[in-house]
Amino acid sequence: MVDMYASLRSNVGTLGQILGDTIRTDLDDTFLDKIEQIRHLAKSSRQGDSAARKEMLTLLSSLSDDELVPFAKAFNQFLNLANIAEQFHTISRNCDELVCVPDPVEQLLGRMLGGNIDQEKVLACLKTLDIDLVLTAHPTEISRRTLIQKYSAVIDSLTAQENTQLTEQEKKQHHLRLRQLIAQIWHTNEIRNERPTPVDEARWGLCTIEASLWQAVPDFLRQLNQQVEERTNTQLPTDIAPVRFSSWMGGDRDGNPFVTSAVTQEVLDRNRHTAARLYLKDVVLLVNELSMEGANEALLAYTNNSNEPYRDVLRTLRQKLRNTIDYLNGRLEGQHPDVDPSEIIWHESDLKDPLMMLYQSLCDRGMSLIANGLLLDMLRRIACFGIHMLRLDVRQDADRHADVIAELTRYLGMGDYAHWDETEKQSFLLRELSSKRPLIPANWQASPEVEEVVKTCRLVATQPARAMGSYVISMASQPSDVLAVLLLLKETGCPHPMRVVPLFETLDDLNNASACMSALFSIDWYRGYTKGIQEVMIGYSDSAKDAGVMAAAWAQYTAQEKLVAISQEANIKLTLFHGRGGTIGRGGGPAHEAILSQPPGSVDGRIRVTEQGEMIRFKFGLPKLAVQSLALYTSAVMEATLLPPPEPKPEWRQCMQQLAEESVLAYRAIVREEPDFVSYFRAATPEIELGKLPLGSRPAKRRVDGGIESLRAIPWIFAWSQNRLMLPAWLGAGEALKAASERGDLPLLQEMEKHWPFFKTRISMLEMVYAKAEPNLSKFYETSLVPKELHHLGVQLRERLAIGIEAVLELTQAESLMAHTPWNRESVELRNPYIDPLNFLQAELLARTRREEQSSKNVELALMLTIAGVAAGMRNTG
């Protein structure tokens, strides 16, 4: 039998061997031998060899302080290199067909156009697709930007070595380059010395666009155009942009005091600066390309019958882009440069219109072949990225807006808004929204917290509409939460209607979302403001932390169904914004399956989805990977729109409702009602130590005091993934499935898993999490770190994990987890022998740091490296 993953294992082996040689050169044979010995013992330990495990633990505990950092670094870097090999494998020529699916758009177009869907309907859907991927910094990408660039260079080197035409000398050169890169990686500090600022995070997002998406977007659209043309003999429009990009980096101030109005302004300027700089590169290339003379009458008239009409137009654009960069450099340096708007790129049309004139002229003069090269690529970049690169969302907590209005009403002697009921609040807000006089007095001295919210609204008011995305209200629950933001935007002079988006996060808020929106839709003023268009955000992270994944998933599903129904009834065009994380506990998982498992009618050609931290790198970090991801999103949204899944049967709904009710009880019985749970959580995981790691710009807690409810969803999940129990991603679900099976519902569950995409996705996600969970490792953390009087809770949790695994295997009728997804299983198994030693060492280091009043620098750094390494191995942080 052919080994499906031979080339993957070969690359992992090659990279691992080079890393080993690098370590030997830097340290010595003895140290490398010790690493290899521990790795082999970890493999044997995983196969049940208790003597090997004992020997490995003895070796780990005997590591000197000086050995801790290089040891943790070695295993950490091996896991990063394994990730690189896996990323490369999915875009490699040697990639196995089971891993690299054929182009999803090509498959879908074939299925639709070969079936009974009208060609015009398919093309109309494709041309109007509105997929907005929102880049966010949390859960923070653990790897430093400098290392990410080196990892990309490793993939470039592996790609170059695939060329079968290379001479021996060229092969040696590429291998030498690989060795140099891995040596650079080994000698680079992996852990940031300082926590990144929100501006650093925004720059990281811009780097992803420059390094990958800038090339991937036109590449993808060229492939898409070719597929459509071959099947329909139709060209796609020059300005087609099925996928666009927005960002929360520098705009998300929910619980992050470091995101101020000044920071948001700087990020907006940086976004625009990056766009101008990249467009300038394109124009410089076009000046060289478009040397031809023949032009249509419009272009000749515009250039006064120039001998080089195309170059004349491009030279003017080149100068305007240079002026734009100079202007933005001045702003970023804190100056307020005077500028003639006609001398810079001020509006998108300043850039697009001259280029469209060149495009039309080339086509008119029989030079379409030339027009459809770099010039079309640039036009499509403009359609996707605009002149602001990323549309920036603003996100703020609902309470912060209420605080502004309460402080204002008290100052004006109108009473205390904070003490009014919902009816009184709505009445006041609507009266003020309709009033022609200003509400905020010119001489009002607000408190610093309130002033910052007002400053943000003032900033939004000064920005071009296309620079901004949505104003997202976190923890929204009432119509007044939305109306309050609209009033603040009105009072600060916002000249254009901005999308104001409630984010429903908790179980109760999801269940009440349709009632809240229905109340808003019944307000004439509000309907006039929205002009029949509404966006609503569904929160995955906090609802799962509140109720467990099974109950949260059902609440998200039913909330969407109801929102779609009331929007259709009110003749409102609804866009659902999915706040998914990279992990299962935060709504993560394969995007294609996730979109196809949404309720019928909820996608309808448009969707917004957050793309989180480390998942941005895994999906979009390389141009070829990004093209695959763009194709997956496009095909999934088209399929969900034109071939939506069937409505779930009433008996499926009833069963799912019961599963949700039972799972939330099982989840909360532990997380909320077990008195020792918080103490166990803090002892058994590195939750406290995670707060010290210089990861994202945002504090780990919403409040300094408080328990699990005050902890952000990201560190909550990150901590449990470190000790390998993965608890937030499964607790409650297995117990509910077992109860359903015991009451005779197993055939019904199997029918649901086979025919209902929503339920199938849930079970698939559970399988993946169960496969990654390691009860023996979590028990080791418990033995090393948790007071004995709390061990009973660990026993209970591991029993629940076993119940869940058994329930899922019974449902799927499989002998092992992920039997139907061998690639995912291979991915997990490949990493385990390298993650396990890091886990054992982490538990040892946690015990040391908690025993000692002052740990050595080496112990602290090694602990951080184990945290980074486990995150790299688990392929997710929070």
UniProtKB/Swiss-Prot annotation:
Pfam families: PEPcase. Belongs to the PEPCase type 1 family. One of its GO terms (biological process) is carbon fixation. SUPFAM superfamilies: Phosphoenolpyruvate/pyruvate domain. The active site is at H138, K545. Its EC number is 4.1.1.31. Gene3D superfamilies: Phosphoenolpyruvate/pyruvate domain (1.20.1440.90). One of its GO terms (cellular component) is cytosol. It catalyses: oxaloacetate + phosphate = phosphoenolpyruvate + hydrogencarbonate. It is an enzyme of class 4 (lyase). Coiled coil: none annotated. The keyword Transport does not apply. Forms oxaloacetate, a four-carbon dicarboxylic acid source for the tricarboxylic acid cycle. It comes from the Bacteria. This is Phosphoenolpyruvate carboxylase. Keywords: Carbon dioxide fixation, Lyase, Magnesium. Its cofactor is Mg(2+). It comes from Shewanella halifaxensis (strain HAW-EB4). The lineage of its organism: Bacteria, Pseudomonadati, Pseudomonadota, Gammaproteobacteria, Alteromonadales. GO terms for molecular function: magnesium ion binding; phosphoenolpyruvate carboxylase activity. The gene is ppc. The keyword Lipoprotein does not apply.
